[in-house]
Amino acid sequence: MSEVVVKEQLEQYISKIERLEQEKADLSQEVKDIFQDASAHGFDVKAMKSILKLKKLDKDKLAEQDAMLELYRDTLGI
């Protein structure tokens, strides 16, 4: 592989990574804006983030986590 080809490949990889990093930053800002809008309309952002986290869990894991939380709350009288 010639040095020119290697240089071009490296530049392409770097360019793609830079583009994706910018897209990631843009998406992150969009998510932040959505949370701000939801908050302005009276929604609890902390609760929304908890729901998003729970939605990522497997149904069995979620049921297990709910059962454990209920057990701990009962134990502590909460």
Swiss-Prot record:
Disulfide bonds: none annotated. Pfam families: GapR_DNA-bd (PF10073). GO terms for molecular function: DNA binding. Belongs to the UPF0335 family. This is UPF0335 protein A1C_00850. It comes from Rickettsia akari (strain Hartford).
